[in-house]
């Protein structure tokens, strides 16, 4: 009877086992073909950030959530490989993807506990989970994980699997992979890890937060001890090595990626361009982008601009705290302040600080980054003293929780503030358009708005050279006489009223030459020139310099620069004068490398005299250059002559009520544009002239940029002749002084003979017939805008 019962039980158990094996086999056969392809493992491309470099190899920007550095398995030290294997998978080199004995132990433990508490996942299974599966704790997921681990083991070598694991695993503090973790936790190369450090990092995969040695040092130490004991048990280390490692004092030095702060606007331009092309993939492919700017040029440009903005703001009243945070209880304040300040940047030696307390004597206690506390007395508060607990200033007053800026002046801290006035500087290689320096404002961190590329402002008189160039193309010369006298134009003002423009200084000189008029920036002369050549013709002609039609108002006010453009666009346009008449497009991306260091793309720029389109007659460019040299020598930009160079030319610009100030200066190699103005346009007062505030910025930067470069000037092109103390296109050379425009802007027929080889009298007559105006526009070829040309270049780059 008992034997029969035992036989029956055995049969049932055996049957159940067979049934279970059958079900397992069916499950395997049904699931295995549906497992994902291993292409992502066989062609592993880890998510690596976009890194932007200057031309001299300095990092100027890093973009991407995951901080990872791909490392070959052979470059990880043996001590780290052993530590990880001892911690995560002792039988890694023996099993086929799943550790059967480990699974058996886990199953027993899970049955006893009644839940999925232990997973016994091998390194291969963790690779399967990290790349393909979720983190949910279910038997289905574990089953798929085991099958996928087996598939991985059949396709990849053990070292390749380990390489994937070492580079992909998340280890806390935004570190992905052990190479990145070595930098972030210990600020050292992974190859330089000690045994103690390796064992500490090897404890992180199990639970990065729980075993973070910075946040939970005691738990992390216990985990390290467990791993070292495992290594000893597996004969990976000796007892002496274990004890030394346990007694080693570890120093955690948080790695901070050093990003050069001088070119943040340039780095952001690159980020935007690559994001537009690649989308979110731009931040994960590990691209390394080299730009055209050098950090030394960037620093010189940044300091030149900041100096002018600081000087203008000197003497201004204190505008108040820049922000406010709620500090809550005293015991929580220090931690809250430290966390808040860690997200702020020191700019121009202006250190962010948070007010902790205001004493009865109205001294102010502040906390600096790093936790240091400083008490500011009335002297240290300076111009900000009136803002201390001043209810009239409302939210801007200095009170507990206020965020202010301070500067250390020889050991004494004092309250300072960032200037409200803003500006931009753009410097280009005149022959290629390569950006040599670009600064889009005082502080990138406070406002990422790039005034060099995004601020659409009136260029004022810096636009006049384009009108004068159009006049030369119509037959006027630098010696043409124009009447600098007041003018009233019925129907040309707002709502059809009379337009009565004026010279900025209110003075008029009568008949003067075109050269004299541009040198002195005479508004009346510019208007009469435009009346003479026709607005339609001028607009079409000026588009050759890269301006869009929307930037060129179809009215006489165009002569005064009432359209809107950006500092970058105006610098590009002036490069036509500087390089002999060729249109080049600005660019900041020079080369792009992939994550493995292979050259992926390189800019092939348009080069003046080679493949760049001819925008204007080279003789026209030369004569305009010679005229604008006088602007620097004796005109509104004579402050630029402080460089002591004879090859400099340029033009200042100031808009109505001194709201915008400009200077664009150049020689045949470099074009630099400077713009100054408030983000919300308002008058800068008497100091807000281009020659007063913009020229000094240009001088400070160009003194550095042109250091060591000889001043050769522009070579005179064929077809230009000198006579009567002036330069002429050969066919427009006259024996007597220049033609004269009458008060209406029309040029009378010359009373003297033109040279025999002129081919006809100088053009310049007033365009009154519609047919003639249309003919003028047809004779003026229009090149693609600089935006179109730049897009074509970038498309070829990518």
From Swiss-Prot:
Keywords from the named record: Antibiotic resistance, Carboxypeptidase, Cell inner membrane, Cell membrane, Cell shape, Cell wall biogenesis/degradation, Glycosyltransferase, Hydrolase, Membrane, Multifunctional enzyme, Peptidoglycan synthesis, Protease, Signal-anchor, Transferase, Transmembrane, Transmembrane helix
Active site feature: 88 (proton donor), 461 (acyl-ester intermediate)
Its membrane topology: Single-pass type II membrane protein
Reaction(s) catalysed (UniProt annotation): [GlcNAc-(1->4)-Mur2Ac(oyl-L-Ala-gamma-D-Glu-L-Lys-D-Ala-D-Ala)](n)-di-trans,octa-cis-undecaprenyl diphosphate + beta-D-GlcNAc-(1->4)-Mur2Ac(oyl-L-Ala-gamma-D-Glu-L-Lys-D-Ala-D-Ala)-di-trans,octa-cis-undecaprenyl diphosphate = [GlcNAc-(1->4)-Mur2Ac(oyl-L-Ala-gamma-D-Glu-L-Lys-D-Ala-D-Ala)](n+1)-di-trans,octa-cis-undecaprenyl diphosphate + di-trans,octa-cis-undecaprenyl diphosphate + H(+); Preferential cleavage: (Ac)2-L-Lys-D-Ala-|-D-Ala. Also transpeptidation of peptidyl-alanyl moieties that are N-acyl substituents of D-alanine
GO biological process: cell wall organization; peptidoglycan biosynthetic process; proteolysis; regulation of cell shape; response to antibiotic
Pfam family, one: PCB_OB
Transmembrane intervals: 10-30
Region (Transpeptidase): 378-700
Annotated region described as Disordered, given as residue ranges: 739-798
EC identifiers of the protein: 2.4.99.28, 3.4.16.4
Lipid biosynthesis is among the record's keywords: no
This protein's record includes keyword Hydrolase: yes
Cytoplasmic compartment residues: 1-9
Periplasmic-side positions: 31-798
Compartments where located: Cell inner membrane
Region described as Transglycosylase: 50-218
Biased composition (Basic and acidic residues): 765-777, 788-798
Pathway(s) served: Cell wall biogenesis; peptidoglycan biosynthesis
GO molecular function terms listed in the Swiss-Prot or TrEMBL record: penicillin binding; peptidoglycan glycosyltransferase activity; serine-type D-Ala-D-Ala carboxypeptidase activity
One GO cellular component term noted in the UniProt record for this chain: outer membrane-bounded periplasmic space
Its job: Cell wall formation. Synthesis of cross-linked peptidoglycan from the lipid intermediates. The enzyme has a penicillin-insensitive transglycosylase N-terminal domain (formation of linear glycan strands) and a penicillin-sensitive transpeptidase C-terminal domain (cross-linking of the peptide subunits).
Family matches, as PANTHER family: BINDING PROTEIN TRANSPEPTIDASE, PUTATIVE-RELATED, PENICILLIN-BINDING PROTEIN 1A
Family named by the database record: In the N-terminal section; belongs to the glycosyltransferase 51 family.
Name of the protein described by the UniProt record: Penicillin-binding protein 1A
């Amino acid at each position: 009877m008992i034997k029969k019962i035992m036989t029956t039980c055995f049969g049932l158990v055996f049957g159940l086992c067979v049934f279970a094996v059958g079900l397992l086999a069916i499950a395997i056969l049904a699931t295995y073909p549906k497992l994902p392809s291993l292409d992502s493992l066989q062609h592993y491309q880890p998510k690596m950030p976009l890194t932007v470099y200057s031309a001299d190899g300095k990092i100027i920007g890093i973009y991407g959530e995951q901080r990872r550095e791909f490392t070959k398995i052979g470059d990880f030290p043996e001590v780290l490989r052993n530590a990880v294997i001892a911690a995560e998978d002792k039988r890694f080199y023996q099993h086929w993807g799943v550790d059967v004995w480990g699974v058996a132990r886990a199953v027993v433990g899970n049955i006893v506990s009644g839940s999925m508490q232990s997973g016994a996942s091998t390194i291969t299974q963790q690779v399967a989970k990290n790349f393909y599966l979720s983190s949910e704790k279910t038997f289905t997921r574990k089953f798929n994980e085991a099958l996928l681990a087996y598939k991985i083991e059949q396709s990849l070598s053990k070292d390749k699997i380990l390489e994937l694991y070492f580079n992909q695993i998340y280890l806390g503090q935004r570190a992905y992979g052990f190479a990145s973790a070595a930098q972030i936790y210990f600020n050292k190369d992974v190859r330089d890890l000690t045994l103690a450090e390796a064992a500490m990092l090897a404890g992180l995969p199990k639970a990065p937060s729980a075993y973070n040695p910075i946040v939970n040092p005691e738990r992390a130490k216990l985990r390290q001890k467990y791993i070292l004991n495992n290594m000893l048990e597996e004969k990976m280390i000796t007892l002496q090595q274990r004890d030394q490692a346990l007694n080693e004092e570890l120093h955690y030095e948080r790695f901070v990626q050093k990003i050069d702060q001088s070119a943040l606007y340039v780095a952001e331009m690159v980020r935007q361009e690559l994001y537009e092309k690649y989308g979110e993939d731009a931040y994960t492919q590990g691209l390394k982008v080299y730009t055209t700017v050098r950090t030394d040029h960037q620093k010189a440009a940044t300091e030149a601009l900041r100096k002018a903005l600081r000087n203008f703001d000197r003497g201004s009243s204190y505008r108040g705290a820049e922000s406010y945070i709620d500090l809550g209880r005293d015991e929580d304040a220090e931690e809250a302040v430290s966390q808040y300040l860690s997200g702020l940047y020191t700019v121009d030696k202006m250190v962010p600080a948070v007010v902790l307390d205001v004493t009865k004597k109205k001294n102010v206690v502040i906390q600096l980054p790093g936790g240091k506390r400083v008490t500011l007395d009335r002297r240290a508060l300076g111009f900000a003293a009136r803002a201390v607990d001043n209810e009239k200033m409302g939210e801007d007053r200095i009170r507990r929780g206020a965020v202010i800026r301070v500067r250390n002046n020889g050991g004494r801290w004092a309250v300072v503030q960032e200037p409200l006035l803003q500006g931009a500087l753009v410097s280009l290689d005149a022959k290629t358009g390569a950006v040599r320096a670009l600064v889009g404002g005082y502080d990138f961190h406070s406002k990422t708005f790039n005034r060099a590329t995004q601020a659409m402002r009136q260029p004022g008189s810096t636009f006049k050279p384009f009108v004068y160039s159009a006049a030369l193309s119509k037959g006027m010369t630098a010696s043409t006489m124009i009447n600098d006298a007041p003018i009233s134009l019925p129907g040309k003002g707002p709502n059809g009223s009379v337009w009565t423009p004026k010279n900025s200084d209110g003075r008029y000189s009568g008949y003067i030459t075109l050269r004299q008029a541009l040198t002195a920036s005479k508004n009346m002369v510019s208007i009469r020139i435009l009346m003479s050549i026709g607005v339609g013709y001028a607009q079409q002609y000026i588009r050759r310099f890269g301006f869009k039609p929307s930037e060129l108002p179809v009215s006489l006010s165009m002569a005064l620069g009432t359209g809107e453009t950006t500092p970058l666009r105006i610098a590009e346009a002036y490069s036509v004068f500087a390089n002999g008449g060729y249109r080049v497009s600005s660019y900041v991306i020079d080369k792009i490398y992939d994550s493995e260091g292979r050259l992926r793309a390189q800019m092939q720029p348009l080069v003046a005299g080679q493949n760049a389109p001819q925008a204007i007659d080279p003789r026209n460019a030369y004569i305009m250059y010679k005229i604008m040299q006088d602007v620097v020598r004796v005109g509104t930009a004579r402050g630029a002559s402080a460089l002591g160079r004879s090859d400099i030319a340029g033009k200042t610009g100031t808009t109505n009520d001194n709201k915008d100030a400009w200077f664009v200066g150049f020689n045949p190699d470099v074009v630099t544009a400077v713009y100054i103005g408030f983000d919300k346009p308002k008058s800068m007062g008497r100091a807000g002239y281009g020659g007063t505030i913009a020229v000094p910025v240009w001088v400070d930067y160009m003194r550095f940029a042109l250091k060591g470069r000889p001043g050769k000037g522009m070579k005179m092109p064929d077809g230009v002749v000198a006579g009567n103390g002036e330069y002429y296109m050969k066919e427009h050379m006259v024996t007597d002084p220049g033609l004269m425009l009458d008060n209406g802007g029309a040029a009378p027929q010359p009373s003297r003979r033109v040279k025999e080889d002129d081919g006809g009298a100088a053009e310049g007559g007033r365009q009154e017939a519609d047919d003639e105006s249309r003919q003028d526009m047809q004779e003026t070829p229009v090149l693609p805008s600089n935006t179109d040309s730049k897009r074509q270049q970038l498309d070829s780059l990518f």
